[in-house]
Structure formats: structure tokens, C-alpha cells
Amino acid sequence: MPMSRLFKLLALAAAMIPVSALAEVTFTRDVAPILQAHCQVCHRPDNIAPMSLLTYQDARPWARSIKQQVMQRNMPPWFIDQHVGIRKFKDDPSLSEQEIATVTAWVDAGAPQGKPSDMPPPRQFEDADKWHIGKPDLIVSMPVEYTVKPASSDWWGNFIADSGLTEDRYIKAVETKPTPGGIRVVHHAVTSLVYNDRPEGGTLNEYAVGKNGDIYPEGSGKLIKAGARIRFNMHYHAIGQPITDRTSVAFVFYPKGYQPQHVINTMLSPNNDDLDIPAGADNVRSDAYFKLEKPARLTGYQPHMHNRGKAQCLEAIYPNMTVEQLSCVNRYNFGWQIAYNYADDVTPLLPAGTIIHTTTWHDNSSKNPFNPDSRNWVGFGNRTTDDMSRAWLNFYYLSDEEFKAAVEARNAKQRELSSQR
């Protein structure tokens, strides 16, 4: 047997050994690195998580809860079905099966601390960690604060702020985010460009509970022209106490003078204004369709529903009537409006005439833990107590020549990888 094959078999055998059969799993040596890589960006003081997980003393009281959350894949929040469609994404925080097994073994062993000398150096959090997209080049905030009164009804409105840009710039990433306290009362915030009092510049980004940012593939972006203003379309809801918010939008720019080859389009799938979710129904389906008139590359996808949202799948119906499942969010959680940005080497390449089909399911039964009242019929609407069945899509168009070249390059790469196996 060739030595290379022997080493591969030995490595595979080692990977199949249960964690419990190896040396005792400890916090300092085994669990802390997992928490640093996947959890501490939120689980630290003065952030959105309810507890810190920076130290053993922080984590130990929560050991059983940590085990439960990671085994159920509720934490870290990442709800894409990992057995359907495309499985490679940018900034995927989810744990591997081995990491879940490590955390589980640690808790089952009594959550031992381990040697202090095994503890990795503390993760350093800089300003870049405050934004999913990294350190921004520009941050624009609402011109004034808005305070939500304790018992007020839902409020919708617009705020417009100057960008301060004196020259045209292309952006490679954008993120909209409320203030830390505002996260509790902002149902959604949609930012868009305004030129000469006309919102002709297009949508920038959408924030909803738990939403991260949009990071565009290299060579693609959006243009912000000099003198542009930013519209903040806000939806606030009360939580029983006064909360003040001043939402901001952050940008990462390409270098001055750089013009990306492709301009990103951000669209919301068509409305299902006739959404009809009977009281107590646990699996109500709705569908939406959008046809691509030109070849395109789909770079990101984000489902959007409210409390009764259950699942959503995205598929491509090709001109030859074959169908490809692209992505499914099979455990939708209204508390985490996550944008799933495809890794560059797997972004869907869609020919002209492709129909993008979204299928959405709602659960209005008492089995849904997020359902405020299963006795009520629910229809389409902007209020939190209403619901939606929509999806945000980021894509850019390709010429016929670019599309053909991209498909050929991907096929060649797949042939190369196959020959190496």
C-alpha cells in the first residue's frame, strides 16, 4: 500500500474515534478555542448576547445550556439546511460535528476547567468586530435619535442623512445596524440612496433582527455618487419601556478610482399580498417567482418572514425546465434575519430566462414557540403581528460571453478537483 494512502486511512480512522475515547476534554485546551472562534463575537460584555463566554468562570454556569443549544444547532445561529443545495458560504459561524462532539463531551464530563496554562490568549476585539463587514471606511447615522415610547403602536417613517461624499465611490460591503439598545425595538431598517430627492439610487441594505451585512464578491459592488443622501426607512415596535435608537449604515469602499466589473442588484422577491394563514394551521405554503432576463450570478440570499415563519427554499427553474435546489432554510428563526452570502466559487450561475422560485412555509399553530397567538388568522402586512413570505436577493448580470466563460471555468475547476481524488 502506498504510504500516502496509508496516512490518509490513519487520519480517517483517528477522526472517527469518539471524543470521549480520547484524553479528557477540558475548557482551557478544547472548548475555549471553539468559543473564541464561533461565539465570543456576540457573547462578551456590552454586546447582544445575554451572557459572556470569555472565561471559564463565565461559561461554567451555562454548561448544560451550551450543550443543548449547540446540539440542537440553535447556536451559533445558522439555519441553512446543510444537506440541501449549496453548502459553502462566507462567514459561516456554524460548528462542525467534531466541535459539537467536543462541547458535548466536556459538559458530560462535568465541565472540567483544565490547566490554566492551556488557555489560549484572549481574543482581541477591535472596532472591526462591531461590524460584520469589518472595519468601515464610512459610517452614516440617522440625523436624529428616535425614542420608542413604552406603549406606543408600531411606527413607520423615513429619515434622510447626508453621506458627506464629495466624489463617486464604489462599495464592496454594506451593513445597516441599530444602536445596541435599538436592536430591541427596530423591526426593520432599509437603507437606500437618494439623489435630488428621488430614491433612484436603489436599495443599499436591509436590517432585521439578527441580520448581518452584505459582502460582495471581488470585482463587484455598488456605486455611491458624490452628494448622495441615505434614506433610513424605519419600522419600530414598543417593548414596554422607553428605548432610544439612532440606526447607522456602514460602508467598506474599493480604492479610489477603482471601478468594479459588475454592479450588484439588491431586490426583494415579489409580494404575496394574498398571504392567507388560517388560525392553528402548521404548514401553510406560498410561492413567489422572478424571471431573469439576462444571465446572472446570484451572490447572496436572505429569507424574510415574521413570527409564523417556518421554512423557505430557493430554487432555479432553468429554461430547459430542469430544476436545481439552491438553498433551504429549514429552521427559520425570526430572531435571526441572516444573510447567506455564497462563497465565490459556488455562487449560482443562472442563464437568461431562469425563474427564481421561492417556496415559503408558515406555522400558525401552538407548536410554534414564536407564535404570539395561534387563534388568530394572519395575512400579509408590515406589522410584527402580520407576516410576510419574501426573500432578499443579491445578484449581478453577466454578458453572454461572461456567462459562458464563467461556466467553462467552473467546469474546468471541477474536472481538476475530480482528477485529484
What is each residue range found by the language model?
Residues 1-11:
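Bacterial N-terminal signal peptides that target proteins for export
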Residues 11-13, 121, 238, 364:
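Amphipathic, positively biased hydrophobic alpha-helical segments used for protein targeting
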Residues 13-16, 196:
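Short, linear, compositionally biased motifs with a strong N-terminal bias
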Residues 18-20:
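N-terminal signal peptide c-region/cleavage motif recognized by signal peptidases
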Residues 23-161, 165, 169, 179-180, ...:
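Aromatic- and Gly/Pro-enriched helix-to-coil junctions and flexible linker segments
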Residues 130-398, 402, 411-421:
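His-enriched metal-coordination microenvironments in redox/metal-binding proteins
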Residues 407-408:
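Juxtamembrane/interfacial segments around transmembrane helices
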